[in-house]
Amino acid sequence: MLTKLFGAAVQGINATIVTIEVNSSRGIRFFLVGLPDSAVKESHERIVSALQVNGYKFPSCQIVVNMAPADIRKEGSSYDLPLAIGILAATGTIQTDKLQHYLIIGELSLDGSLQPIKGALPIAIAAREQGFEGFILPHQNAREAAVVNNLNVYGVHNITEVINFFNGTQTLKPTIVNTREEFYRNQTEFPFDFADVKGQENVKRALEVAAAGGHNLLMIGAPGSGKSMMAKRLPSILPPLSLAESLETTKIHSVAGKLNKDSSLIAIRPFRSPHNTVSQVAMVGGGATPQPGEISLAHNGVLFLDEQSQKHFHCYNNLKIS
């Protein structure tokens, strides 16, 4: 029996919908194709354990899973839940009439509970753009994804809830977040206030001009003269983030996995201060599994580079390119 359902792959700060096709036939082997990485291939063991613990038997037949488009590398363990649901649907354990209306994502523990994922916000945006009726994901990420309007977001605790939902024996309560209320609620006070600075009127004037016009600023002075202290207080005099800027900034931090678990939106200007020994990848981003670097994480905020004379030469070249 052939079953089709949908997951998502995060590329940069955007998400691409991934079609997951599962076919069951006579045999005893398990095939997973579509350019999966090691974490995706290891999902077989997590799925087997999660199903057994929750009273379901892994099918004793040949299972072929295809993840399309095949030219996009599928990375991470967030495909565990859609793969498990697809396998059960292909063998008749789950009804398939509602599967194609939902986007499913989540990492499984061995007991069937769900672990949080990275990039829930860009995935939710992609789900809304593609016209999905709902988005099923771990409950830890539900508020983050629910800031996207016109999309039903269902936060689930374990795989049993998802199975019962598709079989019609349980209803899932959507997570509802008023985006504007959440935005204003998260506009907290800055930990460092520019009003605390006493004296240094010329430097304060330069900082105010830089903040008002969005200019770069180079501060030179003797050790202990207050350069770092004043730089840390610069975000408190920057213009407030707009809602569009907040969503843009939150997407970047969501992909990097740096969102506070109690907050679904970043509503204040970010302040990033990387160490002077920061590597090129940490500064610009990238790596084997591409992640945003300090430059991206400081988007719409302040990137503070202290002790410039001790930084590696590649930092300056990267900043010129950026």
What are these regions (language model features)?
Residues 275, 279, 291-322:
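Conserved AAA+/SF3 P-loop NTPase catalytic/coupling segment centered on the Walker-B
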Residues 2-4, 10-17, 276, 281, ...:
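Conserved P-loop NTPase
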Residues 46, 50, 83, 122-126, ...:
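Alpha-helical scaffold elements adjacent to nucleotide-binding pockets in ATP/GTP-utilizing enzyme cores
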Residues 1-229, 266:
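Peripheral, non-AAA+ core regions of ATP-driven protein-machinery
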Residues 206-208, 264-265, 269-270, 280-303:
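Conserved alpha-helical scaffold flanking the Walker A/P-loop in AAA+ ATPase domains
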Residues 203, 243, 314-316:
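Beta-to-alpha transition at the N-cap of a short helix in the ABC ATPase nucleotide-binding domain
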Residues 218-263:
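Walker A/P-loop
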